[in-house]
Amino acid sequence: MAKGKDVRVTIILECTSCVRNDIKKESAGISRYITQKNRHNTPSRLELRKFCPYCYKHTIHGEIKK
């Protein structure tokens, strides 16, 4: 039987440098990845280095609210 909330949750990772550069309108968009995390192992916000196709480099992608 399920107890409480699900352990695995779906999260969205967003490029932090695209968000900062959005004011200058240098990038064509904002890179986002959809993945899952285990709430018991990682209770805090997740940050991963992923490739951003708009910045053309590996940047830090942080977890955002839905």
UniProtKB/Swiss-Prot annotation:
Disulfide bonds: none annotated. Pfam families: Ribosomal_L33. GO terms for cellular component: chloroplast; ribonucleoprotein complex; ribosome. It is found in: Plastid, Chloroplast. Keywords: Chloroplast, Plastid, Ribonucleoprotein, Ribosomal protein. GO terms for molecular function: structural constituent of ribosome. InterPro entries: Ribosomal_bL33, Ribosomal_bL33_CS, Ribosomal_bL33_sf, Ribosomal_zn-bd. One of its GO terms (biological process) is translation. HAMAP family: Ribosomal_bL33. NCBIfam families: PRK00504.1, PRK00595.1, rpmG_bact. Belongs to the bacterial ribosomal protein bL33 family. This is Large ribosomal subunit protein bL33c. It comes from Capsella bursa-pastoris. The gene is rpl33.
